């Protein structure tokens, strides 16, 4: 957002979690911002997995098309806590900050090492060519399980993403390799060093019991985490209100985001994104993410 861009109004629609081809999204950064405007999103954060490569092309596309869209530079960092992969979104980061660029280069090496191990395990299961296939689908972006999933579907090994993860890529399955990510503290620190705000992504998606989710939230807050996602497109009944209560309990600001990866009927940019009463929105507590 430029210095003379207007601040969002009360009627703004924020989507603070989305992915482009810079990681495992299907749309280019240009197509992503165009779709966001079509869906009446007015403030969009591009938060690719361990990559900020989609941000500058998106900025250029917004300027070229003169889109009525404010872009927040973001990233979604993969971390490890108690043997669970936990994602930390950074909002309002300086994508050129040396600490962030060096950190993301390390994450890219970890990603590639994991991809090689996944491919080795799939090859032992008589599924050759997985690494080459996944890297081709990543097209220079951050390679991840989503690319392996698309490769396996194209090979006829599964009908859809849910099935391919269940049969091949979930923990304990043939193509799963344990991640060697950074700690939550390291993720929070580098986000803040680069001028951003640290947000716990999709807290209800980690398969944690209520007791363990509270432990995660307490740990995240203790490590300097500042906000948590409360609203998403797809949520179980009462999940949003429960997450809002957790945000209040742990002193965290509330964020919202679709976690959009590709066009599909149930997850769409800006869809069903609203915050319950009694929480403080991350853009209200930390207006610097809009600058």
What are these regions (language model features)?
Residues 258-291:
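Catalytic core of soluble alpha/beta enzymes
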Residues 1-84, 168-170, 183-189, 194-265, ...:
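An N-terminally biased module of ancient metal coordination in phosphate/nucleic-acid-related enzymes
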Residues 2, 61-218, 278-280:
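Extended substrate/RNA-proximal surfaces in nucleic-acid metabolism proteins
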Residues 20, 97, 144, 236, ...:
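Alpha-helix initiation/capping motif
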């Amino acid at each position: 957002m430029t210095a003379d861009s207007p601040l969002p109004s009360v009627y703004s629609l924020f989507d603070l979690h989305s992915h482009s081809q810079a990681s495992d999204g299907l749309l280019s950064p240009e197509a992503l911002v165009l779709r966001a405007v079509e869906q009446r999103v007015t403030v969009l954060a591009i938060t690719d997995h361990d990559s900020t490569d989609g941000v500058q092309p998106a900025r250029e596309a917004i300027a070229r098309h003169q889109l009525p869209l404010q872009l927040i530079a973001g990233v979604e960092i993969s971390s490890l806590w108690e043997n669970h992969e936990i994602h930390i979104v950074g909002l309002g980061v300086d994508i050129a900050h040396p600490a962030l660029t060096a950190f993301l280069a390390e994450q890219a090496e970890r990603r590639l090492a994991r991809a090689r191990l996944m491919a080795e395990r799939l090859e032992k299961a008589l599924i050759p060519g997985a690494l080459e296939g996944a890297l081709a689908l990543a097209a220079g972006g951050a390679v991840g399980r989503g690319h392996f999933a698309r490769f396996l579907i194209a090979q006829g090994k599964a009908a859809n993403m849910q099935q391919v993860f269940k049969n091949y890529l979930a923990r304990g399955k043939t193509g799963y390799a344990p991640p060697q990510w950074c700690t939550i503290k390291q993720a929070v620190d580098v986000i803040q060093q680069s001028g951003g705000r640290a947000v716990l992504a999709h807290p209800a998606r980690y398969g944690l019991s209520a007791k363990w989710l509270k432990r995660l939230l307490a740990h995240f807050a203790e490590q300097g985490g500042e906000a948590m996602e409360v609203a998403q497109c797809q949520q179980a009944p009462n999940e949003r209100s429960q997450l809002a209560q957790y945000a209040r309990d742990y002193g965290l600001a509330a964020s919202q985001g679709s976690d959009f990866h590709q066009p599909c009927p149930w997850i769409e940019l800006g869809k069903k994104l609203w915050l319950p009463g009694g929480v403080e929105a991350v853009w209200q507590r930390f207006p610097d993410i809009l600058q």
